[in-house]
C-alpha cells in the first residue's frame, strides 16, 4: 500500500487529549511504507482550537491545509486535489475544482460532503463529480460504504459508530496499473451492528 486517503473526520473530535493524539501519531509512525493524506471535515475542522494543532505530526501524515488546494505525490505519479474544512457547516455548494493540468498523472479528488439534495455539510452533485475529469473521487462524511456515481466512492467509517450503522464497514483498495484501475471494497470492522 503506497498511500491512504482520509476524507475528513480523521479525529472526529476537537476534545482529544494530547496523550490520545500521541498514541494515534505512534500508530501512524508504524506504517513503514505508506503515507496518509487527510483532509478535515465537519467534526475536525481546522480552527484555532483544532486538535491537529496540539502535537507535531509524523512526516507520514499530511493534513491538507484548510480550503481548496493540491498535493503532488510525484513518486506515485499522482496529483490529489482537495477541499479541507475550517468550519463545522458548509451549506453552499463548492465550485468544483478541475484536475491538474499535469499530463501522465493519476488525478484524485478528495472531498468531505453530502450527495443528498440539501445538506448543511457541503452539498455535492454525484453526477457532476463523476464527469469532472478526475480518475477517482474519494468522499467522506457518509459512514456507509457506497458508490453514488461512476468513479465516486464513500468508503464509510472503518468501524460502525452507532446502532444506525449496520452493514459492512471497511475501506476501498484502489490498484492502478497504467490506464487500468481496480477498486475493491475490503471489509475491516472488528464489530458489527445487526437488527434482530
Model-derived features: where do they sit?
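Binuclear metal-dependent phosphoesterase catalytic core
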Residues: 68-74, 155-196
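His/Asp/Glu-rich metal-coordinating catalytic cores
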Residues: 3, 12-162, 168
